[in-house]
């Protein structure tokens, strides 16, 4: 049977606060062997790292900014983002890019 990886898990969402262990257990029981833990804003980083360290054998993590949060970015935010990347050595950079589906940040803010 093939192994499956979910490369975009938003486990920092409050929706997972009560049953994350069970969610991971069910996924592993269904052959999902790796989880990409996505950091979509710096305010999620502490929670993300706590989750990552609890499930380190099956997770990798990213640090970035989802385009919906582009309106939060300024020079100080970018400085903190670079520091977080340097200190925490994520497996990848992300979220990044453009996303106009819900228009939570304007085109100008995302560019």
Feature locations, PLM:
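Mid-domain alpha/beta scaffold segments of enzyme catalytic cores
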Residues: 1-111
């Amino acid at each position: 049977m093939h192994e499956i990886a979910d490369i975009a898990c938003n486990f920092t969402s409050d929706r997972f606060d009560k049953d994350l262990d069970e969610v991971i257990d069910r996924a592993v029981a269904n052959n999902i062997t790796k989880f990409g833990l996505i950091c979509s804003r710096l305010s999620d980083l502490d929670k993300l790292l706590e989750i990552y360290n609890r499930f380190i054998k099956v997770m990798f993590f990213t640090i970035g900014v989802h385009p919906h949060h582009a309106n939060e970015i300024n020079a100080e935010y970018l400085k903190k983002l670079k520091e977080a990347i340097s200190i925490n050595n994520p497996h990848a950079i992300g979220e990044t890019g453009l996303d106009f589906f819900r228009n939570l940040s304007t085109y100008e803010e995302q560019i």
